[in-house]
């Protein structure tokens, strides 16, 4: 399963993990020294959000910061004619509203 938000497109990013030793100057030491830098990944906080649209249950995988946007989409979809469509087609129509 992909680690990408379906609404915002947030995806994992690469960041550095820095290991240090020593005492900080502000605490009376000679300063921190870097002893190692390694790559790490930071993942978006993806959550599954299930909503009911046109009698169908649809699941979105979205970042936690965009959960309210899903409910906004559902409100906007009330004027659309979505009856008779499959859940996948309904989801596609909702994402077009963005």
From Swiss-Prot:
The keyword Ribosomal protein applies. Keywords: Ribonucleoprotein, Ribosomal protein. Part of the 50S ribosomal subunit. Signal peptide: none annotated. This is Large ribosomal subunit protein bL28. The gene is rpmB. It comes from Thermus thermophilus (strain ATCC 27634 / DSM 579 / HB8). GO terms for cellular component: ribonucleoprotein complex; ribosome. Belongs to the bacterial ribosomal protein bL28 family. GO terms for molecular function: structural constituent of ribosome. Pfam families: Ribosomal_L28 (PF00830). The keyword Ribonucleoprotein applies. One of its GO terms (biological process) is translation.
């Amino acid at each position: 399963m992909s680690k990408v938000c379906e609404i915002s497109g947030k995806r994992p990013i690469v960041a550095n993990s820095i290991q240090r030793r020593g005492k900080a100057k502000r605490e009376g030491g000679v300063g921190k020294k870097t002893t190692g830098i390694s790559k790490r990944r930071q993942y978006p906080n993806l959550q599954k959000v299930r909503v009911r649209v046109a009698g169908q249950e649809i699941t979105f995988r979205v970042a936690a910061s965009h959960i309210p946007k899903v409910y906004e989409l559902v409100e906007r979809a009330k004027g659309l004619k979505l009856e008779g469509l499959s859940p996948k087609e309904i989801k596609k129509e909702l994402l077009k509203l963005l």
